[in-house]
């Protein structure tokens, strides 16, 4: 049995001289003078000070052991530690913001690719009229038929070609014309497309194709003897596809080559889809 559960009490039955004399030598007299009481609850009394001190030391050591054990088994996670909880919350917020920003950037990139890149993988670069032109448009003119444009007309400017200084060449073209340039788009030798009247307004090019609305696209240069360079032709094809994507051009359209001294251009474009004929302007 555990010593903490035993309480010992000593009492003297009679104050006999023999008992007193024997107790001076460390003896308690006879065995009848010793009373042992076993307390199941092990409650200490004033007659057992040593046992009370032992019990207090045992309880103290037990409480220390329990506290050390609890502290050692406490998980180091964000829920038990307020500081770590705040740090983890901050990191989760940063991670969520990064994910949202990445998703928005990806969506913007995919949208840009859809509007700028045709199906055959060639990038279409369009320079707006307000960016390259020194002149303000004097009225946008007549809007296209909302049903869609049924004709694409290709021609050339008959001017110098350009590769690096295309805005300068186009400025000279603007100054040589009375009013606006009579085209919707100009396809330059630097592989860029420059907006004139754009996708929504009729150009001032002579319309002698039964009055059908036409997208007029002019190659910058003179192509009576040789066709435009490859990147110009690819940019023109991309411009047609982009017009179809925007539903400006009808799916069943016709392609014409118009203008004087455009024989080389006609020989190149007659192999394109929807090619109809080559006509000289009146």
Curated annotation (Swiss-Prot):
Principal localization reads membrane
Instruction: Report the GO terms under cellular component.
Output: plasma membrane
Where is this gene product found? Cell membrane
Task: Give the superkingdom in one word.
Answer: Eukaryota
Bilayer topology annotation: Single-pass membrane protein
Query: Which molecular function terms from Gene Ontology are attached?
Result: peptidoglycan binding; zinc ion binding
Q: Where is this region: Disordered?
A: 1-29
Q: In which tissues is it expressed?
A: Expressed in uninduced hemocytes and mbn-2 cells.
Summarizing the function annotation, the protein's role is: Peptidoglycan-recognition protein probably involved in innate immunity by binding to peptidoglycans (PGN) of bacteria and activating the immune response.
Q: What is this protein called?
A: Peptidoglycan-recognition protein LD
Species assigned in the record: Drosophila melanogaster
Q: Gene of origin?
A: PGRP-LD
């Amino acid at each position: 049995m555990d010593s903490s559960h035993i309480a010992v009490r000593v009492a003297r039955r009679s104050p006999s001289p023999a008992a007193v004399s024997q107790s001076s030598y460390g003896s308690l007299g006879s065995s009848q003078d010793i009373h042992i009481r076993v307390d199941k609850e092990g409650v200490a009394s004033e007659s057992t000070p040593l046992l009370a001190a032992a019990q207090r030391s045992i309880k103290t050591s037990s409480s220390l052991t329990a506290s050390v054990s609890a502290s050692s088994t406490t998980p180091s996670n964000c829920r038990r530690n307020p500081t770590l909880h705040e740090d983890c919350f901050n990191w989760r917020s940063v991670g969520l913001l990064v994910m949202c920003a990445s998703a928005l950037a990806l969506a913007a990139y995919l949208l840009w690719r859809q509007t700028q890149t045709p199906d055959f993988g060639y990038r279409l670069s369009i320079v707006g009229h307000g960016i390259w032109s020194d002149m303000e448009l004097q009225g946008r003119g007549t809007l296209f038929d909302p049903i869609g444009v049924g004709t694409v007309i290709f021609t050339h400017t008959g001017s110098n070609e350009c590769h690096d200084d295309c805005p300068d060449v186009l400025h000279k073209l603007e100054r040589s014309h009375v009013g606006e340039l009579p085209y919707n788009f100009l396809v330059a030798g630097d592989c860029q497309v420059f907006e004139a009247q754009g996708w929504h307004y009729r150009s001032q090019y002579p319309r002698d194709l039964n009055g059908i609305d036409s997208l007029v696209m002019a190659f910058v240069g003179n192509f009576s003897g040789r066709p435009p360079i490859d990147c110009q032709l690819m940019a023109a094809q991309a411009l047609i596809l982009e017009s179809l994507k925007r539903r400006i051009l009808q799916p069943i359209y016709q392609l014409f080559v118009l203008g004087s001294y455009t024989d080389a251009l006609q020989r190149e474009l007659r192999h394109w889809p929807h090619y109809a004929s080559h006509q000289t302007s009146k």
